[in-house]
Structure formats: C-alpha cells, structure tokens
C-alpha cells in the first residue's frame, strides 16, 4: 500500500477494495484497453515512488535497480497467478459473477482464509492512509519550518479537515484532486531528474562517490520493502481484469504497464540518488531547492493528497459499515434509516469514520520516518499480499494440474516471501 489509492474508476463507478467487481453480464460497463491502462497505473503508482531515491541510497544504485526490477517481475507473475486462481474457481463453481481475493482465501482455507486475506488488505490500506498523513506532515513542516511546527502539529491540524471530508458519501467531487495529486507527483519527479541533469552538466557530480552495492546487508531488504510498497496493487487485480472489455488481452497489457512502471521507478530512484547522494532524504521532495517553483510543487502535492485521503480510506469505511450492518443492536435501534448502507444510522457512520481518521492520525504521529514506515509496510503486509498468498492459493487450487517446475516456483515464492517478510520486518524495526 504504497502510498497507493487502491480504488480504480470505471467511468463514474468505483471499484472498491474488496467489493465484488462488475458481473460478467454487465458488458456495457466494461472498460477499454486505454481505460484499463489508466486504472492499473492509478492503482499501483502513488507518492510512495518519492521514497525510492532514499531506498537507493540505503541499498546502493545497482542493488536498488536490480531489486526494483525483480520486484516488478515478481509482481507481474503473481498477479497472473491470482487471475488463474479466480478463473479456476469460476470454472469449478460455474458462476458468472467474478470472484474476489477474499473468495480465493475462503476456497483455500475456509472462513479463516477469507478473514486473513481481507484483514491483510484492510491493514495494508490503513498503512497507505497513514503514509499519506506522514507525507503531508513532513512536507508542510519542511515548508513552514520557520514557524516551529512539527510534523505531528500539521497532522493534528489535518484531523478536523479529514474528518469533515470523510463524511462526504459521494466521492465524485473529490476525484479531480486525485488526478491533481498525480500531476504534482509527476512534476516532482521531473524536478528531481532536472536537478540531476543540471548537476551533471555543471560538473557538480561524481559517479564514483555513489555506492553501487551497500556494504550493510540490512540495506537490501530495507530497499526491497520500499520497492514492494511502491508496487502493491493486488487488491485491485481481479477487479481490473474483470472490468476489461477484452479480458484475454489483460496479461499482455499488464506486462507492458508494469514494464513501463518498473523502468520509471528505476530511472527515478537512480536519478534521485545520483543527484543528492548521501544527502538524499526519505521523501525526495524535501531535497528540492527552496524556491517558489519547488515549494509550489510541494504545496500542490499536499493539497491534492489532503483531498485524496478520503478516497484512500473509502474502502475502509465500506468494510467497517458492512460489518456494522450485521450487528443486531444497530439493526434493532436504527431500522428506520435506509440508504446504500442499509440499516446503519448516519450517527454510526459519522462516528466510525471520525474514529477511523483519528486512529490513523494517531498512528501517523508515532511514525519515525516515511522511508522506515514504507519499508515496514512493504516487508510485512505487502509482501504477504503480493507474493505469499497468491503463490499459496495457486498451489492449493491448481496444484494437481501443475508440473514440477511450476510447483517449485510457487514453493520458492512462498518461502522467499516469508523469509523476506520476517527478516525485512526485523531489519526495519531494529534500524538499518
């Protein structure tokens, strides 16, 4: 959950985190290849990419580049595993309605499997939401450093704003801000690349001063965690594939998009580290020069993300409110209220949404650094969602029909994913 918006739009409709994607029969709502391409990019690429140069600083430019490439390829492979699992499940049960990630967990491990899958996705989405707040707080505290306000101060200032925005039930009014934030994100990346080019032209740069492979072994899993965090978008894989008009073309389209994203990630991480070397900060925008154009980009990012935050937490609200509908006490005392959330009262909705924002803000205020937090989420939640679960489900559902080579790959991915999750978590907690 990079900083990632794990909702993708198809026309005016939203494809939420765990909610079932469009049915096979609703062909009129399907997306074109171009629309699907855009949805894939929105689902994967977020402001987490602005932490990649710092990961390259920790691991070294060569190790960082290879790590991003490996993660990009593994992401593509495991996304295809998910699709194969879903297709197998649909063919066995003969149902036209597309299955979700949680359905795969239920088929493989029963109710516990569904709860595990949805819990990991829910927690990862919380992690991405916390990262939004940390990113905004760090940038604003840097811009207004002369006022003596810390990151925590700005996060507290954001709380009432985000609470009010979270009460908006329709997200259509906020969707332009998501696009605005993405534009600012791209501009910030261009600024960093421009800085690097200018430093090379002016001679204020020495390639030999940049580390290729870190001598500290802990730097490699740290950078790997950040890379996994930047690629995480598995919660949307099945929904995006199901929503495409020509579903058979999805794997090829996904390969092209992920290849392009991987190239941009490597280029940006490399250029960012080359530009600032050991001075590279965990959010690269903090390295930008203190001029009006750089400050405008930072403020633009913060404004865009402030209004995008409700979109980020929307799937969380949906999950919580779906659970509330099953509580007998609420159904008994608020059965007079009926809308899209059923018998859940407005008071319950506003209360839970307020508590969610306050809780996420409290966690964000305790985060020691953006890079450390991104690596922690990537090493734990995202690694399990992206690699361990898809390979495990693939082995369970299609195991009898797989050859020895494919089974070996699945087992290898599961083992490597678990080792990476355990060691990466330990390494991030104790510090690089």
From Swiss-Prot:
Keywords: Amino-acid transport, Endoplasmic reticulum, Membrane, Transmembrane, Transmembrane helix, Transport. It is found in: Endoplasmic reticulum membrane. GO terms for molecular function: aromatic amino acid transmembrane transporter activity; neutral L-amino acid transmembrane transporter activity. The chain crosses the membrane at residues 36-56, 63-83, 116-136, 148-168, 173-193, 220-240, 257-277, 293-313, 354-374, 380-400, 411-431. Ubiquitous. Highly expressed in flowers and cauline leaves and at lower levels in stems, leaves and roots. It is a multi-pass membrane protein. Residues 1-30 are annotated as: Disordered. Residues 57-62, 137-147, 194-219, 278-292, 375-379, 432 are lumenal. InterPro entries: AA_transpt_TM. It comes from the Eukaryota. Its main location: endoplasmic reticulum. Pfam families: Aa_trans. Disulfide bonds: none annotated. Belongs to the amino acid/polyamine transporter 2 family. Amino acid/auxin permease (AAAP) (TC 2.A.18.8) subfamily. This is Amino acid transporter ANT1. It comes from Arabidopsis thaliana.
